[in-house]
Regions:
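Structural signature of Gram-negative outer-membrane beta-barrels, strongest in the C-terminal barrel
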Residues: 259-263, 391-394, 406-408, 453-594
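Transmembrane beta-barrel wall of Gram-negative outer-membrane proteins
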Residues: 200-282, 320, 381-387, 392-408, ...
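N-terminal Sec signal peptide and the immediately downstream disordered periplasmic leader
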Residues: 1-82, 88-93, 213, 264, ...
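C-terminal beta-signal and adjacent terminal beta-strands/loops
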Residues: 701-721, 752-808
Length: 808
């Protein structure tokens, strides 16, 4: 990305607060007032660096210690001192939060071990298990969790456990909330930030960001944010499309929000957000590729962070959001309305030459046909309207409540094409004249697979929650009634496709998700809570198998489930938690047990290059999570967060061969989830002179072992038989791999000098010991055509300079 793409806008809010410590909590307030309280509270007072973090996890403002369930908030200062630039980086510091990296812009989020396996780009019907919000706007989208820039965020909240009562479907495991800094009346302030970094044995990264807050008279203010970041690549590609650092990328965007308060009671906040994220390649470290491997002539053994390409790859996500939040304070109650529109245009362009070439070998094509470059292009176009309106109490009495309605309309169109120039000529020459035209089903030439899947999803919901405090006890109860309808068409064609057309497939569901919480507060420093809550995820319909690609055994095993519906996933979460905060110490912990019914597990259908969803009748997660922070000495802050989760299937598929293939066996682990995860951070701050202070920060992060898909834990280590006699490879060539993703440890260091005039200079090293973590396993055609792992970023050394100014 060229430097001219970077936008600069002026100036800064003060850094946000350090981890939460006890003080007298604010009275709860409703809705938009709540966020104003939170924004103002999450600023460091002039005389004290430690203050309570205020969150709006219950759609009311309260301290983390007063929220009656498990919640974490990473503040702006936490994000800055961790040098984090993605949700994945944040997740390693949050107990119970896991982000599986499946390539740029393609992340799966799970909370507390509620995970159903790897969702891939061609499963648009699979719903997310964690809801994601930008302030009040729903932005969740299954695999494509938006990789939003973290600049000028007030905080990132992680709400653990099902949140369907207040946040709806998609929050079956939990909810992530990106909370932005809001416009401030009567204040001119801002910040500029510049960064440069170098990736070990990789490319240079750099970025420029800015924010400005300015008054528009006495009753309005505007806040504008702009940012541009270039991410240095670190994967080297061999082959005709090879090059150094092919997975570099960029993220450019901004947002503008306006606050208008014509009267003290009325607040109107329109906002527009735009972001374009791109990657010029994927972070895939290959072990075997049809075109280059230890058996080809000449042989090739891949080194660390290498891959082989016939075509360059690309990811692009253009996201536009327009929303309007309005509130009116009637005195005892406040009315809030949130209207939002989201438009996303996503492209995943992969080098699928190994996939297409492996099929061509099976079909007996000559080498020239096998060597054709083949580009799998998956596009997703999303238009989503949502409307929420709610009423909430605003007083300080013992009874507090919120009640509202929600509606959403989603149009999602998924296209898949496999352009392979010259392919039809080899098809007709090998399989008979006219074959390519006969299987096209109306699609264009030289594309052996094509599919169109338009979806329309409508949701209506009513929700409410109330709490009553009497003496040391508080009882909270609420629920959400929902009604979903999903309509889907499926049209495909080409040599690899079954050539089927389904119009108007419909999935419907309605129900009620309750939550009950009891809280005991024997004193102002301690609270104990117990909870029972239900979560829900909408079902759907499986796609048909790509029969041409299937082996006879795979077709017999998986065809009974193809083009069949799968049921809604539901769960009940039971937990008990404790929150303690006194003086320099804060300790929060929870134990939980989740019973899952009809878990929607995603599996690979062998060599068919198809994915199916299976309902597993019973599964569970049981675990404990804890977060501890302390301020034992002046200037020294310590924090420790960790979780242990035992997540397992409690059912076995009746067919023993299918059970082994899929890994859906009683006692097997749920995929993508580490049993143990922890993070420890230490920060020491001291005055440098009468005009500045310096600090050093060190963090250690441990992520335990995981499996990408449930079937990976069967017959592991596993031998993949390629059976592709091409380019010198024998028919019996095989590769043996351990599919258990090993645990990994990261150490990050930073040191900064912060001046009283708003200037800050930070030097940092992320991944100090240059760990090469395996984040997920990548396979093509059940491992026959390609094998590899998505890996993490190498050691990165950088410098960030910030300048804050204004404030009056």
């Amino acid at each position: 990305m060229r430097a001219s793409s970077y936008l600069l806008i002026g100036t800064a809010l003060a850094a946000l607060a350090a981890p939460a410590f006890a003080q007298t909590p604010p009275a709860e307030t409703g809705n938009t007032q709540a966020e104003e309280v939170a924004q103002n509270a999450n600023q460091p007072p002039a005389t004290e660096a430690n203050t309570d973090i205020i969150v709006t996890a219950t759609k009311r403002a309260s301290t983390i210690q007063d929220v009656p369930f498990s919640v974490n908030a990473q503040t702006e200062e936490d994000i800055q001192r961790a040098n984090a630039n993605s949700l994945e980086a944040i997740a390693r510091n949050v107990a119970g939060l896991t982000v599986q990296n499946l390539g740029p812009g393609q992340s799966q989020v799970s909370v507390r071990g509620v995970s159903a396996g790897q969702i891939v780009r061609d499963q648009p019907g699979v719903k997310e298990q964690v809801g994601v919000y930008l302030d009040e706007s729903v932005i969740s989208l299954s695999l494509f969790t938006p990789d939003l820039d973290l600049f000028d965020l007030n905080r990132v909240e992680t709400l653990r456990g099902p949140q369907g009562t207040l946040f709806g479907s998609g929050s079956v495991g939990g909810t992530i909330r990106y909370i932005t800094n809001q416009p401030k009346l009567g204040r001119t302030e801002g910040m500029v930030e510049a960064n440069v970094n170098t990736v070990d044995e990789g490319d240079i990264g750099y970025g420029l960001k800015g924010v400005i807050n300015a008054p528009l008279g006495d009753t309005a203010a505007v806040r504008a944010v702009a940012y541009g970041t270039h991410f240095g690549g670190f994967i080297d590609a061999l082959g005709p499309a090879g090059g150094k650092n092919v997975n570099d990328g960029s993220r450019v965007g901004g947002r503008v929000s306006v606050l208008w308060e014509p009267t003290p009671e009325l607040k109107i906040t329109p906002r527009v957000v735009y972001q374009e994220a791109e990657a010029d390649g994927f972070n895939r470290q290959e072990v075997y590729n049809l075109y280059a491997n230890p058996f080809t002539v000449p042989p090739l053994n891949f080194k660390q962070r290498q891959q082989y390409l016939l075509l360059r790859e690309k990811f692009r996500d253009k996201t536009a959001i327009a929303d309007l939040t309005a509130s009116y304070d009637f005195g005892p109650v406040e009315l809030t309305s949130i209207t939002s529109y989201i438009h996303r245009d996503i492209l995943v362009s992969r080098d699928a030459s190994a996939l297409t070439g492996s099929v061509s070998v099976d079909l007996g094509f000559p080498d020239a046909g096998v060597n054709l470059p083949s580009n799998l292009r998956d596009t997703t176009k999303l238009k989503q309207w949502t409307q929420e309106a709610r009423l909430a109490s605003t007083g300080t009495g013992p009874f507090q409540w919120v009640f509202g309605g929600f509606y959403s309309h989603v149009d999602r169109i998924y296209h898949q094409r496999l352009p392979t120039p010259g392919y039809d000529a080899f098809v007709d020459a090998t399989l008979g004249a006219g074959t390519s035209a006969a299987v096209a089903n109306g699609f264009g030439p030289d594309s052996p697979y094509n599919a169109d899947l338009p979806y329309v999803i409508k949701q209506t919901a009513l929700f409410g929650e109330g709490s009553y405090r009497f003496n040391q006890f508080k009882l909270t109860a609420g629920g959400r009634w929902y009604d979903f309808k999903e309509t889907r068409d499926f049209i495909n064609g080409g040599l690899f496709a079954p050539g089927l057309t389904f119009i108007g497939d419909t999935t419907k569901s309605n129900g009620f998700s309750p939550r009950v919480i009891a809280t005991w507060e024997p004193n102002r420093n301690l609270s104990v809570n117990i909870q029972a809550a239900k979560g829900f995820r909408l079902g759907g319909i499986n796609d048909p198998l790509n029969e041409t690609l299937c082996s006879p055994e795979d077709f017999a095993l998986y065809s009974p489930f193809a083009a069949e519906s799968y049921d809604d996933e539901t769960l009940w979460n039971y937990e008990a938690g404790v929150k303690y905060s006194k003086g320099p110490i804060t300790f929060n912990a929870a134990v939980f047990h989740t019973q899952i019914k009809d878990l929607q597990v995603t599996v690979d259908a062998g060599e068919c290059s198809s994915r199916l969803v299976f309902n597993v009748p019973k599964a569970h997660t049981t675990g404990v999570e804890a977060e501890f922070s302390a301020h034992p000495l002046p200037g020294l802050d310590l924090s420790l967060a960790g979780s242990y989760v035992d997540s397992q299937f409690d059912s076995t598929i009746a067919n023993p061969i299918l059970a082994t293939r899929t890994g859906i066996i009683d006692g097997n682990r749920l995929p993508t989830v580490p049993r143990f995860q922890m993070a420890a951070t230490a920060t020491y701050t001291q005055r440098f002179n009468d005009r500045a202070e310096w600090y050093v920060n060190a963090s250690y992060q441990h992520v335990g072992s995981r499996y990408t898909q449930p079937g990976d834990q069967e017959n592991n280590p596993r031998t993949f038989f390629h059976e592709l006699p091409f380019n010198g490879q024998p028919l019996d060539a095989s590769t043996t791999l351990n599919l258990k993703l090993p645990a990994y440890d990261l150490v990050n260091l930073s040191a900064g000098l912060s001046f009283d005039n708003g200037m800050e200079v930070v030097a940092y090293v992320n991944n100090l010991f240059d760990e090469n973590p395996k984040l997920s396993f990548d396979r093509e055609r059940n491992g026959r055509a390609r094998l590899g792992f998505n890996v993490g970023q190498p050691r990165t050394i950088g410098v960030t300079v910030r300048k804050k100014f204004g404030g009056g």
